[in-house]
Amino acid sequence: MKAFIVLVALALAAPALGRTMDRCSLAREMSNLGVPRDQLARWACIAEHESSYRTGVVGPENYNGSNDYGIFQINDYYWCAPPSGRFSYNECGLSCNALLTDDITHSVRCAQKVLSQQGWSAWSTWHYCSGWLPSIDDCF
């Protein structure tokens, strides 16, 4: 009986943990949100290396006490308000929890803002994406 209760609790908690996307589902959703097609492979590469395409990831604490959130691992010191209430510049004007949901709209909009202000090198994993990029041609 205890095992059954644990399984039910895990099943109910699973949706709150986000979802795992793949290169094509990410590319299609970002395209539907208006992201230019010539950027989609770069975003797929970043998502692969930052979160393994998982929307519900909160990264380990950084050297300054901040954390990174969501599929693009957006930093809470600069871009979103952390749940702890700790100071944040909150440039995207949203709660970091909004970056952890199945709906990637907030993550995409905030990531686009990061890109426009800091460029691709804002992501520490960008060096993995500066040469070879995953193909998205078969996604459409």
UniProtKB/Swiss-Prot annotation:
Example GO BP: defense response to Gram-negative bacterium
Signal peptide segment: 1-18
Record-annotated disulphide pairs: C24-C139, C45-C129, C80-C96, C92-C110
Annotated GO MF terms: lysozyme activity
One Pfam entry name: Lys
Tissue expression profile of the protein: Found in the midgut.
Protein's name in the database: Lysozyme B
Species per Swiss-Prot/TrEMBL record: Drosophila melanogaster (Fruit fly)
